[in-house]
């Protein structure tokens, strides 16, 4: 498969780069706030999460270009739905319960929201 032809037919290289860059910036903004509050997930986590979610959405939307016209059915929305499931497990990992105190709910919600922002930017 010629990747240059693939990118020109579906999404431009600059548009792909801008989408990933904006996802990086959005993840950085959320991560900076979490870092200033010295929470579990900081800048690096949120940037990686936003960029990975955006990239996965780009792949789910444009990655099955070579299957067009074949008998194979590809449903890119399945990939997106699994991002939500995976991020939910990641978010659950930062929630701690000690006695009657629950910590990490806001960070978990931030992780989930960051993934959603990345998905929206990649779609």
Predicted regions span which residues?
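Alpha-helical transmembrane segments and their membrane-interface boundaries
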Residues: 1-77
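C-terminal ends of transmembrane helices
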Residues: 28-39, 90-102
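Small-residue-rich segments of transmembrane alpha-helices in multi-pass membrane proteins
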Residues: 48-58, 82, 109-122
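Ligand-binding beta-strand-loop-alpha-helix segment within the catalytic cores
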Residues: 60-62, 80-90
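Interhelical loops and loop-helix junctions of multi-pass membrane transporters/channels
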Residues: 66-80, 84, 101-106, 110-114
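Gly/Ser-rich oxyanion-binding loop with an adjacent helix/lid
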Residues: 88, 92-99, 106, 110-123
